[in-house]
UniProtKB/Swiss-Prot annotation:
Species assigned in the record: Frankia alni (strain DSM 45986 / CECT 9034 / ACN14a)
GO biological process annotation, one example: urea catabolic process
Coiled coil regions in record: none
A cellular-component GO term for this protein: urease complex
Composition bias, Low complexity: 122-140
Catalytic activity: urea + 2 H2O + H(+) = hydrogencarbonate + 2 NH4(+)
Residue segments, region Disordered: 122-150
HAMAP family membership: Urease_beta
Protein name (record): Urease subunit beta
GO molecular function, a single term: urease activity
Amino acid sequence: MIPGEILPGEDPVEINPGRPVRTVLVRNTGDRPVQVGSHYHFAAANPALDFDRDLAWGHRLAVPAGTAVRFEPGVEREVDLVPLTGARIVPGLRPESAGPLDGRAVRAGGAVRAGGAVRAGGAVVGDSPAATPGTTGATGDLPGYLGEGS
């Protein structure tokens, strides 16, 4: 064994076991690629991404920790989201989602989340009907994730 060496097991690793999953259709309406990290509050992602932000409220990408999903300009793709857990308080990030994720209304930086919609400047942000609820986690190939054997 080499000091610091990681010896992963043979079996696949289940990601987010037992967590409910939502599938959301996302389109990058901007002219530049957008990358969203694994634990970022997805409803607060770059405004150039068009998707149902209400459905994404309180959720993050269902991908391994430390990874990200890249959205190319003009391209649509489906992503799976899982609920943020723990205290469910978002520290900072974007003003429209900073603070507690649960409650009757959340206000920050001129944006309001009330009645199930994320509103900024009086307009609902995002409105995609293509979202479906689902159930739990995917499995991943840990050696592949660690960059071994690729």
